[in-house]
Amino acid sequence: PAIGIEISPLSAMISRVKSQFSSTPINGAELIDSLSQFYNMKWEDFYNQHSADSINHQDVLNRPGNAIPEFANIERWFTPEALLGTSIVVEYILCQKGYVKDFLTIALSAKMRSIGNVDVDVVRAEYRKTPRENVNVLKLMKSQIQKMLKGINDTLSYCSNVLLDESSVQVIENNVLATDLPDHSVSHII
């Protein structure tokens, strides 16, 4: 068996998505098609009720189905359009279950710097001096899903002889010093 210990919830989720995929195949074309249909329907519904020239952050935050809470300086972190796209993707993710839900959450997380008004090449997130324009959240998500699935497929084809099945991989979200493991149960630490 393999045990991973991550103190960060996001790191723990990334570890689970990267290590527990073998018994949960994802049909990339179906997933992208389903996300696209949902996204386009919600996008059109929103713009049928709001003028494209005058949408603001509050309109997006008040949108039925939005799960993103208001937070300080939201208008500096997102354009209204990028916030709407992110809101729709989050709504879609919340409709999913299990591995697919975690997979999509990691895909969105990987693209947040490209979606928000931040410079992508800096270690610490800072506002961009000029807001990012024409952010296509759906396109970014589709490319990230394809990239992640390619990585999974490459791993399956090149490393299948060393992969463990999902039930023998455990990711513990905790501090390694506070995790109770049986004596002599660890043979390697990475």
Give the predicted meaning of each segment:
Residues 2-6:
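Conserved SAM-binding motif I beta-strand of class I
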Residues 79-190:
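SAM-dependent nucleic-acid methyltransferase catalytic core
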